[in-house]
Structure formats: structure tokens, C-alpha cells
Amino acid sequence: MFGSIEKTPENLGLFTRCSQYMQGEGLRFILEADRRRAWQNSGTIIWQLNEPWPNASCTNLVDYYGETKTAYYQVKRAYEERHVSLDYRTLTYKRGENFCLPFLFPTAGKPFREK
């Protein structure tokens, strides 16, 4: 996705989009894991919402100019009242390998009933 880290990226826009996607995936993964641990975990707060100066680091959701980053939308989806999440422990499954992935369908404290 990112290519070699020994040289300057040839396409800075693509590099930025990929890095923002990875930031959002990390936050989404953490938030979903925390929600699956309800009520052992009381909740999660994003430490820093916005950036104090123009930069390309940190876990914030809004950039210095007030524009929402990719992570904003991934976090927003992870906090939806009805959001299915997989409990996966690795991303290195082999082609054709069988595995079981438990999932959770949290409903913001409301019981879930099949129709």
C-alpha cells in the first residue's frame, strides 16, 4: 500500500489517503473491540478531536483547517447504534484456510430480538 519507506513518496496525495485510511482502521478496530467488551469497558473517548497546527500525525479526526479526515467517518460508523463488528485476532489468514470469526451486534443497551 505505501511502498518503500527509503524514499519520498512519488504520489503524496495517495500516500496521505492511505495513511489516513490506516489511521481510521486502527481507531475503528479499537472502538469495535471496546464495544464488544461492554460492560467490562465503560467507553472510549478520542483524545484529540482536531489538530492545533497543520501536520500529518496524531489520532485526531479533524485537520487544522476544520476538514474531517477519513478516520472521522470510520469512527462515526463504529459508534452507530446498530453496528456489526467481527472479533478477528489476525489479518494473516491463508487462502483456503477455515476459521471462525465471532461477531457482535451491539444495540446501545437494547436487547436484540429476531423477527
PLM-predicted stretches and their roles:
Residues M1-F99, L104-F112:
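Substrate-binding clefts and catalytic carboxylate motifs of secreted carbohydrate-active enzymes
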Residues K115:
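Terminal RNA-binding accessory module
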